[in-house]
Amino acid sequence: MKKIFTLVAAALCSMSMMAKEYTCPLVVNMMGTDMPVGDVKVNVDEQGEGKYTMSLLNFDMNGMMPVGNIVIKDVEATKCGNVTMLNAAKDILITAGDKKDAEGNAQEWMGPSLGNVNILLKGELKGDNFNAYLNIPLAGGIIVGVKLGKNCNEMGQLPNAGFEKFHEASYDNAKSQEPNGWHSFMSSTGSMAGMVSAAVHTYASSEVRENAAEDNKQCVKIVSTPVKAGTLVVASANGTITTGRLKAGSMTASSKDNCSFLDFSSTGVDANGDPFYAVLNNKPDAMKVWVKFKAGDGNKHPKATISALLTNGEYAQDPEDKKHAANIIGRANNSSIESKDEWQEITIPFTYDNKNEMPKAALVTMSTCAVPSGGSKSESNPDVLYVDDVEMVYNADVKKVTMDGEDITNKFDEAGELEIEGYNKNLDINNFQLEAIGAGAYVTKKITADSFNTYVSFTVTSNDLKNCVTRTITFKDYTTGIKNLETLTLPNGVKAIYNTAGQQVTDMQSGQVYIVKYTNGETKKMIKK
């Protein structure tokens, strides 16, 4: 009997670990306008084998539009350091809720009348917090954005990207202000760390640009410092911050032992308790940054630099080491930021070596000089780089649309609509292709019909799910027949996915082998990681 009770207790304990209820602030976004709804309960249940189920019951857009129960099963989970990222592109049926209206009467729920609804989900589990963003297509082509969690807007962005929060970093008796989530030489490692860690390179500054947002009160000020041997100035130490950790490992300034680096396996934390890495399970197209740079006295290389490496979470460093090149998925770099002593916004595009792999982390590094130890040696007039509002940019636009192999991109009107009469072929969703603008954009294709017409619609959704564009082809009085009446969501550039049995599928399961056909004509065999 005791053994039975022990087994029951263990089972109950296991169940409590697998299922968790979160109280999340809910914001509904319609046509670009945020509408706060209040707190709601969300269940996130671990299914096992790296899958979760997310349940948002009785979803009601602030009393204006009762939608119903949104339950998404088989949500893919990716462990990214101290965060579990959730991703899904699923066709689901939204069922009726059971919540009564204000008078205690049963409500009419919209969800069941929508049929299969293709929902895109990005979420994160971090400690006791859950954040998520969902795209839900409703009737009439309306796409509703659902924001869950107090930090939902920070998903897909760097931590403390506006540099509004700082903590005190220290080394021996030296102290400085480091932006939360960012790190200077004061928290560096390496055999030479003792020589550079006492220098103050970062400050919280109120030197924000004009016309900044009302809540933009601070930015980070990064300065170079002189390196001294006794009282003799022998070199310049570039002011540098990174989302990873700085390493001072060599007396030779240009050595790759002097670098920024990240590694999810690292358990170290900074003075604020944050890890020395930034989670980014997204595919941005560019990075926008506001900067103000002034070169100091004696600077013969008056160019500041900002770089970003998107990685798989394993060890990577900047400057790069060829031994770890396979861990890098994408790059962005600007090593020619001019000394203008005024605010300017720069946009740095990302390029991707591995277009099929989704990043897990971002190593972003900013320095007062693009040349190692190449800046000012002045103590009174050093190089100064102000940085504010780093933004990862996610594109959603249309590059090319084809129908039965014909390019019809320029035939759509300004609203993205195209009418066709007299079409007499069977409609096959695979004969309609759209090439999107957006490195990680999602392309959803759908064939629908009413009593009068048949429609082929495309929706391009940015990788962070916050922007989308549509194209719709209306076939007037179409009567020939429809093949493959369905909804299909695929990553940008993918034409179709097949399993080893030759069946077309809409998503891939970890560890399985697939044949992937691309819009550029290539076909590849791959294993889903």
Question: Which residues are covered by each model-predicted region?
Answer:
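Bacterial Sec-dependent N-terminal signal peptides
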Residues: M1-T23, G502
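Edge beta-strand at a domain terminus
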Residues: A19-T23, P36-D39, N69-G81, G127-L158, ...
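Short, solvent-exposed loop/hinge segments that bridge or flank secondary-structure elements
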Residues: T23-Y52, D98-A102, N173-S197
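Predominantly extracellular/secreted and cell-surface proteins with exposed
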Residues: V37-G38, V42-I119
